[in-house]
């Protein structure tokens, strides 16, 4: 380190001495004073401006103050310089006629350097005086070698064998670093054998099975003086002699040469045959290294591979026999295995039939409550499907049939097409809405309806078809009392029920009960066990009202005395809305005739109190309001009439 620094200082002193020489005091290109750069391509002293232009032409330039020169470069520079370069490159240059360019004009300097050093226009024909063709080549080659060494000094990678062994068996011990690459690989392998028997077994098995079809790797048997590394023998019986030839430290002898590696392990002379014959454990014991050496251990391991393969083949059926059904860790011991229930495909002999939510019961093929409609012409099966109806009150069910005590199927067969109508019964008011756990279904064959029943049904349907009259919800006439229509319906009910009861009382029993309720409403109730001759059970009869019931329809009175009274006429005994006392207290004011000229006579009511709604109008919702009707609860008060509902207006 100190020598190189002293050499650099000495070289710099020599170069500065060369700069003081008269030919080197000025730049060779522009003749400027004090050049500070050296063009090592032509070994000339140039100024800073010319050095930049030289770099444009890829000429090498060094700074005297900032760069370091080697001893060779200093020697070549002593033999060269500006004077020597003028003799070579400016030999035909006429100094009286031609002037050197100024450094301020870069174009002329660039043209000068191109003509002199690149095109060599002013060089002489005799090149024998060229100073340093050989010296320049020598310096260039030396410089390239030096730069290559400095570049690869810390980046050289080890040979492939050593690199492979280091990657496979770990770092190499420090004692083996001073040897060649092949010896390093062998010692790395041997050291890995000694330190880790498990890795040795892995290596032995890998060498045994990897060399069956191809040649062994050159890195495994790479020795500088060994035989052919690309042998194709499978078991490699000569591996012991090769190991003896490669490493004299591990020769086959009874004397333990491994004392240097294991200085305190001579007492461990245990013979462990199980460790040699077992595949899972370490392949060799320390005794095999200390007593017999590496070659003996390798031969013993080679001899035991055949028997080991036989033993492992004997153990394979035991493993195959012991393999049973896999144990489910999530299954509790003794817990029954739950079978997966497929709701779309019936299982084979299930313990409990699954509920099919996609197919409706076949006996109720024409039930309108079924949201998943089935086929109309589907025949009833020989065995009815079992349904588990929930025991919840008030819940709607789509697939389950409507609750009924008995159900009947009416079959009308025009040709091959069969239409099944389910006639359900109307529950009594005292019947609860709880569904039975197992609803009764019809038998395999549908019930046959007697002829009178069918005749009544056909007559009713024919009347409906023949008389397609629209339903008039708002009749125009006030006297159109629905009592007559209700009486007609009662007569039809009586006649139909009597005929059906007399014809076949075993299948259908109907009884019409007419009762007068507390509010005077006459209702018709069909008890359980009967049906309304062909009509579905969910069709109820409209209640019929008697003549006395019109008086008690609206018994509720408004709490506001200024509202229009809608009570019936006989409620005038109630003094809450009676205006007779108020009207009697008011003075009798006669309206002048002048105020009555533009008013028609119907607007002058005989009563100051607004008229009441009649009973039929009240029953019909108050739609037909007759303003011209006068009440008889008070005497006439003359032609005076209050047009508003407020008596104080």
From Swiss-Prot:
Domain Arf-GAP residue range list: 12-130
Low complexity bias: start-end ranges: 150-159
Zinc finger (C4-type): 27-50
GO molecular-function term, one example from the UniProt record: GTPase activator activity
Spans annotated as Disordered: 124-159, 209-279, 294-316, 366-391
SUPFAM superfamilies found in the cross-reference section: ArfGap/RecO-like zinc finger
Biased composition (Polar residues): 248-257, 269-279, 300-315, 366-385
Domain of life according to the entry: Eukaryota
Keywords, sorted A to Z: GTPase activation, Metal-binding, Zinc, Zinc-finger
Record field: compositional bias (Basic and acidic residues): 127-146
Keyword Zinc-finger attached: yes
Function field: GTPase-activating protein (GAP) for ADP ribosylation factor (ARF).
Name of the molecule in the record: Probable ADP-ribosylation factor GTPase-activating protein AGD14
Organism, as annotated: Arabidopsis thaliana
Source lineage: Eukaryota, Viridiplantae, Streptophyta, Embryophyta, Tracheophyta
